[in-house]
Regions:
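Small/polar-rich, solvent-exposed N-terminal microdomains that initiate assembly or binding
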Residues: 1-78
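Acidic-leaning, charged glycine-interspersed low-complexity segments
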Residues: 28-36, 48, 110-165
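Polar low-complexity intrinsically disordered regions enriched in Ser/Thr and small residues
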Residues: 50, 69-72, 101-104, 142-144
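Ser/Thr- (and often Asn-) enriched beta-sheet segments in non-cytosolic proteins
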Residues: 57-59, 64, 83-85, 145-147, ...
Length: 167
């Protein structure tokens, strides 16, 4: 695959890339601040994320003219803020049916689920840092929801969808 180098692209064209870099960095730093361990695989991407191992992924869904939550309700002038819809997903291994065909105990299932509850709550604490991009800066607000997917392939994925302004 020939990956195109963007180092010479006009800086104005890098706003979305820089946002994705920043959201990933802020997420990692925030989880570290709360002493919540993260998988070593950490990245951002465009579109849906394949879940094939433990990982932290930031994925781009869309960008639009207008404030967070004000998507296409009225025609917008070109000078208004842009908002991006992103998903921050954290996939972790969970107890599954063993090679002997025996299901994990309820205690093991609950113990394996505890980190997903922590992940969902830390995501909701993180939103302040995504709204206030710079320290002591007042943001335009965010829209955020956190949810947990069905167990799939031995993984549980906690995802926060966030709509935020592009700084």
């Amino acid at each position: 695959v020939n990956i195109i180098d963007v180092s010479t692209v006009n800086p104005d064209a890098l706003s979305l890339k820089n946002l994705l870099d920043g959201v990933l960095d802020k997420t990692v730093s925030f989880f570290e601040e709360y002493n919540v361990p993260l998988p070593s695989r950490q990245f951002w991407t465009m579109g849906n994320v394949a879940i094939d191992c433990a990982q932290l992924a930031v994925s781009f869904t869309q960008v639009y003219l207008g404030l967070p939550g004000d998507q296409a309700s009225q025609p917008q002038r070109c000078s208004v803020p842009r908002s991006a819809v992103l998903k921050i997903s954290l996939s972790r291994e969970i107890p599954v049916v063993g090679a002997n065909g025996k299901a994990p105990t309820g205690d093991r299932i609950q113990a394996g689920s505890e980190i997903a509850a922590v992940d969902a709550w830390v995501f909701m604490l993180l939103i302040k840092h995504l709204d206030q991009w710079e320290p002591d800066e007042f943001g335009l607000g965010v829209i955020a929801t956190a949810e947990v997917s069905d167990f799939e392939g031995g993984f549980v994925t906690t995802t926060m969808q966030v709509t935020m302004s592009v700084p």
